[in-house]
């Protein structure tokens, strides 16, 4: 379940996608600290300063991503030259992008200042994250995320549903319960 907790990278990615100003970013992080501490990575639950510093670091990365990405091969060469090893796969999970969707959905609904729901078609959700069909493992992961983030999927007229029962082109509406 550790991979479902909010990391600084997750928070920065969500904030970047929301295109918030500096004060709005600070307010957003303050709300997360006050209300979502149970969902924060364990290293941040008692250290607000570290959470803000690490999130700010990643926000800086996203603001100048092309330049920093251009330097990545040099960092890898330096690590190899000094006998070190950079294991990028240690920082991702099989469903990292999909996890970020559910994390973002919860935070946008609760603190985005707009709608109290997120909606999209099942086809869009699957296509956006590179899936072509609902496998049992993917469904298990969907249900795990929905349960963990206290989200409930609905179809039209606020009828509760299960994602696998929704038609591929039907709109799914997620709300925090």
Positions of PLM-derived features:
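N-terminal intrinsically disordered, low-complexity, charged/polar
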Residues: 1-7, 89-94
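Long, low-complexity, charged/polar intrinsically disordered regions in eukaryotic proteins
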Residues: 44-97
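Short capping segments at the starts of secondary-structure elements
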Residues: 6, 15-24, 115-120
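Charge-enriched amphipathic alpha-helical scaffolds
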Residues: 36, 41-61, 126-163
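C-terminal edge-of-domain segments
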Residues: 158-177
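Short glycine-rich, basic-tinged beta-strand/loop micro-motifs
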Residues: 34, 112-133
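An N-terminal amphipathic alpha-helical segment
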Residues: 91-120
């Amino acid at each position: 379940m550790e991979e479902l907790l909010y990391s600084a990278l997750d928070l920065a990615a969500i904030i970047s996608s929301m295109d918030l100003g500096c004060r709005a970013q600070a307010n957003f992080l303050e709300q997360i600290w006050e209300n979502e501490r149970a969902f924060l990575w364990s290293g941040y639950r008692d250290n607000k300063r570290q959470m803000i510093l690490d999130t700010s670091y990643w926000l800086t990365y996203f603001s100048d991503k092309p330049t920093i990405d251009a330097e990545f091969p040099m960092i890898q060469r330096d690590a190899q030259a000094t006998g070190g090893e950079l294991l990028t796969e240690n920082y991702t999970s099989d469903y990292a992008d999909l996890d970020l969707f559910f994390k973002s959905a919860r935070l946008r609904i609760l603190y985005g200042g707009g709608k109290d729901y997120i909606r999209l078609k099942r086809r869009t959700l699957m296509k956006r994250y590179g899936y072509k069909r609902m496998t049992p493992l993917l469904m298990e992961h969907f249900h795990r995320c929905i349960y963990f983030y206290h989200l409930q999927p609905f179809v039209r007229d606020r009828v509760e549903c299960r994602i696998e029962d929704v038609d591929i082109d039907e709109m799914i509406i997620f709300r925090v319960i």
